[in-house]
């Protein structure tokens, strides 16, 4: 999988260099004056968005957020804008009255939720252009309660190959652990995967930066308290390359892990656990089951870049072949599949890499290029029945969607646009009525690779020109 346009860099060592975390109190930190899903919520609150896709289930549903509704959407205004001219690929994490986010410059920020003022910042790595482009932080942070100290802690991966545990209050370093250190001469290892915190462990995927070259992909499990490496899973045999884990690990109701994987080497794209959704034991990372994309559906650069979503006793993910696959968690057999968008050809038609939002009733998809009523559109937003994938409604967009949609309890879906269409209005975050597919508002700004999130009665987004906060004007 070649990771998108302006946000790319690249890949490859043949062996994974992994070491346990080491505690240290040094680093570049500047502060201003002044676990499981349950563990994540304990550190945050019902008004927060504490992790990528709102937690290990990856449902992107903020049930308690009801300020932004179909009626109030017309009164949504920009409250603040931080970091003008700075690109952000990671999505905002909101917890305890602050927004946590890393930038393409390598700086990780804690911003005041109501004003955007910088409360603290820490440099966590930036990779210069080598065989891929220059890149900073792409992974979204998780805020969760440390199982030993019971203090709120921020977990985030840096471009320098480390997983960081930071004090939530001032971003001081608690520990850091090696994921996989990038080469000095090629853009090999890079962490796109946002850390998943569950049951005292942290799970992180290992991937290349942009397939130049491929690396041996996998998943690493760490102790949440110390950063010690507990287990590792590789997608391809020792000595082989491929099977990057670009996405983030999902956790099912029973605690089992679900991982979506990238393509194998060109000579065998289905090597090992490549092009698969894999079920892993949460303690040992032993393989408990696998669904692999049928060979007939494997094309050029078609792999899983989207993170899995848990749908009751099922789990699913969209492949870059444009198809969403829903599986029975117990048997890992296919329940149904449906086409969301066109197959990707190295991003030329966009990519189906957004995880659908799920509110317990319907699945809401943001898609890449597709044809609706005989007309080709750059993207779409769709609602589908979780039982069989049947289309409930579909709304064409003049931009493709890369960031995952999110939904609040007030009845509004936020869909970030990324791929612009020549001659069309600027890309935007679309506010959509989930009952009908009606576009309620366009919050226009830059290209949005990240997910827009609902927290504290507001909406937070990030794009190629900074971080934004949106609220309902009284």
Range-by-range predicted roles:
Residues 1-27:
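Secretory targeting and sorting signals
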Residues 7, 23-33, 37-41, 141, ...:
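N-terminal compositionally biased, intrinsically disordered segments and leader/signal-like regions
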Residues 9-13, 56, 63, 114:
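N-terminal functional modules and adjacent low-complexity/disordered segments of proteins
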Residues 20-30, 227, 389:
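Generic low-polarity alpha-helical segments
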Residues 29-70, 474:
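Sequence/structural signature of beta-propeller modules
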Residues 45, 64-86, 94-101, 106-137, ...:
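Extracytoplasmic/lumenal domain signature
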């Amino acid at each position: 999988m070649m990771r998108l346009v302006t946000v790319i860099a690249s890949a490859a060592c043949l062996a994974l260099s992994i070491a346990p975390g080491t505690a240290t109190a040094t680093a570049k930190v500047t502060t201003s004056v002044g676990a499981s899903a349950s563990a994540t919520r304990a550190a945050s609150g019902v008004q927060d968005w504490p992790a990528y896709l709102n937690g290990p289930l990856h449902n992107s549903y903020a049930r308690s957020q009801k300020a932004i509704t179909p009626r109030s959407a017309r009164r949504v205004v920009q409250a603040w804008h931080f970091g003008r001219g700075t690109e952000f690929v990671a999505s905002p994490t909101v917890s305890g009255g602050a927004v946590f986010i890393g930038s393409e410059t390598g700086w990780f920020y804690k911003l005041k939720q109501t004003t955007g003022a910088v409360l603290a910042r820490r440099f966590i790595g930036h990779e210069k252009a080598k065989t891929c482009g220059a890149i900073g932080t792409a992974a979204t942070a998780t805020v969760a309660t440390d199982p030993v100290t019971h203090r709120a802690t921020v977990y985030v991966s840096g471009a320098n190959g480390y997983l960081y545990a930071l004090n939530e209050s001032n971003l001081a370093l608690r520990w850091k652990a090696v994921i996989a250190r990038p080469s000095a001469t090629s853009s090999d290892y890079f962490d796109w995967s946002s850390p998943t915190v569950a049951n005292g462990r942290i799970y992180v995927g290992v991937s290349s930066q942009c397939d130049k070259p491929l690396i041996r992909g996998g998943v690493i499990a760490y102790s949440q308290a110390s950063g010690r490496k507990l287990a590792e899973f590789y997608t391809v045999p020792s000595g082989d390359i491929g099977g990057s884990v670009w996405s983030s690990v999902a956790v099912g109701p029973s605690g089992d892990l679900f991982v979506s994987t990238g393509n194998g080497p060109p000579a065998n794209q289905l090597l090992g656990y490549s092009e698969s959704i894999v079920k892993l034991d949460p303690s040992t990372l032993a393989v408990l089951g696998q669904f692999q994309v049928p060979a007939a559906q494997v094309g050029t650069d078609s792999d899983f870049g989207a993170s899995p979503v848990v749908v009751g006793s099922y789990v699913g993910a969209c492949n870059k072949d444009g198809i969403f696959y829903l599986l029975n968690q117990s048997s890992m057999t296919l329940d149904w599949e449906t086409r969301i968008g066109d197959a990707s050809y190295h991003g030329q038609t966009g990519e189906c890499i957004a995880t659908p939002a799920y509110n317990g009733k319907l699945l809401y998809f943001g898609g890449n290029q597709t044809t609706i009523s005989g007309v080709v559109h750059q993207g779409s937003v769709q609602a589908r029945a979780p039982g069989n994938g049947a289309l409930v409604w579909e709304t064409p967009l003049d931009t493709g969607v890369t960031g995952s949609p999110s939904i609040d309890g007030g009845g509004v879906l936020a869909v970030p646009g990324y791929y612009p269409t020549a001659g069309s209005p600027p890309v935007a975050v679309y506010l959509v009525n989930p009952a009908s597919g009606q576009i309620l508002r366009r919050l226009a700004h830059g290209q949005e690779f990240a997910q827009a999130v609902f927290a504290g009665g507001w909406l937070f987004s990030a794009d190629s020109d900074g971080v934004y906060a949106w609220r309902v004007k009284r």
